[in-house]
Amino acid sequence: MSILKLKPSCKDYLWGGHRLVEEYGKEYEGEILAETWELSCHPDGPTVIVNGPSAGKTLQQYIEENGKEVLGKNCRRFRDFPILTKFIDARENLSIQVHPDNRYALKNEGQYGKTEMWYVMDAGEDAFLYYGFQKEIGKEEFAKRIQEDTLLEVLHAVPVQKGDVLFIESGTIHAIGKDILIAEI
């Protein structure tokens, strides 16, 4: 089996920038490039093979045609390919998010949950992200803070710099701040 070269799926969310094209040579015709999904079988952005006899097929098609064995013996236990690797160029702040765990996501969304690992490829001088709560709050306070747009006041603002690595376990409230370039697994 030869090495597969993949073409990423490109995402143009409003908060994205230009660095993935200008500094990392990603091919994209749009004005804003927020994310490239480098290794993906996700239906919203599959990567496409660009070399060899499987050129033009998605990674998912390749796996279906050649069997899960091409991924190694441990992948046989997964229903779907369980990894999504992406580069994120956050020119602006991202929304606050909480991702479900596998049990909830498989039952309610039909796909795996999302625990993330971030490697900060680059960051501005005052760059930070939000990670978890400063203190425990109840459902009522949570709802009130969302309504009043004060939720950020009770989240940890974590300064980041190039080379930092962060583990974001599913169920953890988080958000990427502006002026950060991240590799996410």
Q: How would you name each of these model-derived features?
A:
Residues L14-R19, L84, L155-D164, A175:
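Gly/lys/ser-thr-rich phosphate-binding loops in alpha/beta enzymes
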Residues E116-W118, A175-I185:
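A short hydrophobic beta-strand segment most commonly corresponding to one strand
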Residues I96-H99, P159-K178:
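Conserved metal-binding segment of the jelly-roll/cupin
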Residues I137-F167:
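Active-site glycine-rich loop that binds ribose-phosphate moieties when present
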Residues M1-I137:
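Transition-metal
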Residues N108, L129-G132, F142, G177-L181:
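A short secondary-structure junction signal
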